[in-house]
């Protein structure tokens, strides 16, 4: 008997059982898919709050990128900041609530970092103050920056600060490692 003959001569009660089995399997798969889609991932739903005092460091001595500014010598810099996290629904935001103001007045304040599911991230538009050498006036240029900090097992956070400078003598990108350590 050929395979096609067996399929044609199937017992009707066997077909009903097979259909019932497949429907049950499909129903269970749909229920599992719905449960997965309706419950957010643990990392996204429950970040470790970023609260308290942190020594935040920008490793400017290690900067890279395509902007001429990325090749200018600069020392690492940092300060102690206090952050507080607030969550609403499935969105958490850590806000800098205390610490020194930036030297550049165009950087939006306060700084806020949103939890993405794996890191704290911030982005903002501002004006880069392009250093053109001793005795020359700085050139202000439109820029967009984003910083990300990934929590580490030791309680610190490490990441990157990336700036795209849109115009002028410093046009290009500047990328620097960043870190935050409990203070």
Predicted regions and their residues:
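Internal, hydrophobic beta-strand segments that form the core of beta-sheet-rich folds
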Residues: 139-165
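Edge beta-strand at a domain terminus
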Residues: 156-183
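Tryptophan-anchored aromatic micro-motifs
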Residues: 46-72, 157-161
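A short, structured loop/turn motif at beta-sheet edges
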Residues: 46-53, 84-91, 113-120, 148-157, ...
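Flexible, membrane-facing loop/turn or short amphipathic-helix motifs
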Residues: 61-72, 129-138, 165-174
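Beta-turn initiation residues at beta-strand->coil junctions
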Residues: 58-59, 98-99, 124-127, 161-165
């Amino acid at each position: 008997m050929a395979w096609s003959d067996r399929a044609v001569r199937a017992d009707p009660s066997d077909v009903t059982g097979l259909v019932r089995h497949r429907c049950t399997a499909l129903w269970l798969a749909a229920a599992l898919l719905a449960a997965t889609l309706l419950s957010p991932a643990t990392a996204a739903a429950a970040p470790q709050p970023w609260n308290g005092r942190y020594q935040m460091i920008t490793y400017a001595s290690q900067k890279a990128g395509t902007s001429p500014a990325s090749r200018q010598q600069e020392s690492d810099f940092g300060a102690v900041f206090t952050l507080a996290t607030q969550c609403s629904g499935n969105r958490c935001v850590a806000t800098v609530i205390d610490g020194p103001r930036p030297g550049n007045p165009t950087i939006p304040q306060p700084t806020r970092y949103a939890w993405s599911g794996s890191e704290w991230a911030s982005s903002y538009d501002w004006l880069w103050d392009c250093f053109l050498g001793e005795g020359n006036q700085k050139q202000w240029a439109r820029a967009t920056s984003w910083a990300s900090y990934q929590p580490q097992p030791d309680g610190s956070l490490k990441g990157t600060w990336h700036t795209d400078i849109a115009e002028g003598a410093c046009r290009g990108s500047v990328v620097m490692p960043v870190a935050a350590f409990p203070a």
